[in-house]
Amino acid sequence: MKVKAEYIWIDGYEPTAGLRSKTKVLDGAVSSVSELPTWGFDGSSTLQADGGDSDCLLKPVWMCPDPIRGGENILVMNEVCNPDGTPHKSNSRAALVDIAEKFKEHKPWFGIEQEYTLMDGKQPAGWPQEGFPERPQGPYYCSVGAEDVAARSMVEDHLDLCLEAGLEAVSYTHLTLPTIYSV
């Protein structure tokens, strides 16, 4: 049975990098990230290589079930490497792994927070059609009720999908406006 592996990586844009992905079709299910092949991509389109020498490599480092496609399909997180296999300059994960290894006796912890705003057209959902909310930010933070919170079911779905995919999500927080959350 064919399986779709969505290879995901961080591009070279600055100051804010973006996510990129492409789908590789595998001949069957895999049980370990070590079974996944390294794969190439054109780094000139992601600001990770020049046009004349644009080969970059995707080195799988973590995988989880794909909660959207379901079945045996997977999401594959990758490090970006140069053609010779060394970490690309945009690959900050490789440096982090080196530091974590150097200080492993201290048992370092790393956390990532994904903060996002749900939009309605060109403005945050729940905002007045013209201008800004009449209230300051404080009343929205960790609040409850339809007056202060919007799209909570969407955020619940987001958290559920993270957990189903095996991500170590530990919380979500309603932040400073009706549709700003962090997971």
Briefly describe each language-model feature range.
Residues 1-175:
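Glycine-rich, acidic/polar active-site loops that bind/position phosphate-bearing ligands
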Residues 174-183:
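Single conserved hydrophobic/aromatic residue that forms the stacking wall/gate
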